[in-house]
Amino acid sequence: MSEDTNLVMFTIGGNDVNFSDIVKECFTLGLRDAKTCKEKVADANTKLESVKSNTLTILQKIDNKLKNDAQVILVGYPRLATNRNYILDNSGVRYDAGAGVRSLSDASMEIQSTLVQEWNKSHPSLKVTYIDGVINTFDGHEPDPSPKHRNPQRWINELLETEGKIKDNGQIESESSSDTNEFYHPNITGHAEIAKLIAEKVGVPTFNNQEPSTKSDIDIAFVIDSTGSMKDNVGALRARVNEIMKKQKKVPPRIALHSLTTRTTLSSTLKTT
């Protein structure tokens, strides 16, 4: 991240609370288990305070790096299930997984909202905007937790799909996918709805840097932390970056995309680059 960066937008915390384990143990047919799902959700709730602490540390490193007029936007998470009654009942354990996972998302929003308020009160040099409307905007558009159904108005990829986009009939159509990186992340329509929320709350970002005097090619690097939940998915992410590179080569100006694997944390990366 260069010192003249104008805008930083990010989500944070999902990997810290082992989001992928929750998807597997609570929603994936053949793997879901009431006892383990309950434990994973409870464990995630206990980690929310550490997520808050880690986020504040990262914001401090951003503040140390960027100019005072930079914009920082933290985007909240949607819930991961509709309010359909969804009970896991096996091995002598009965657990309301739907309610538990939705409650975790609500708690995450409260934590992030509080940390942004605390940050802005004590750090006048760098203000952070929190996009807190994601949960309400996505209400009714989350994945259907039942493996027997899909929510036809979902804005989040369910299992085994990607590229979900709303059609003229008001329903989502998607492509099949075995890439676990796509599951339970916003689909195309979901990303568009998040973009609307950002535009409504922040408007079009203003950039104060002067236009570069030369029209040189652009290099973009993806730095992947392979120590956490991404460690088993680095290959799939590299493949996706390569797909983007092939498409971009057909369109000027030339943009070079690189994927770099690192065993450092994000906070360390910000400190050393």
Task: Specify the residue positions occupied by each region the protein language model found.
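Short beta-strand-loop
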Residues: 22, 80, 85-87, 256-273
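Mobile gating loops/cap/lid regions near enzyme active sites that modulate substrate access
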Residues: 82-107, 114-188
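Von Willebrand factor
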Residues: 214-269
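Short, amphipathic alpha-helical "lid/cap" segments that border enzyme active or binding sites
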Residues: 48, 52, 56, 188-199
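Hydrophobic, aromatic-enriched interface-forming segments
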Residues: 51-91
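Structural recognition of the beta-strand scaffold that forms the well-ordered cores
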Residues: 6-11, 16-18, 71-76, 128-132, ...
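Second-shell loop/turn segments in exported
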Residues: 41-49, 98-101, 179-186, 221-233
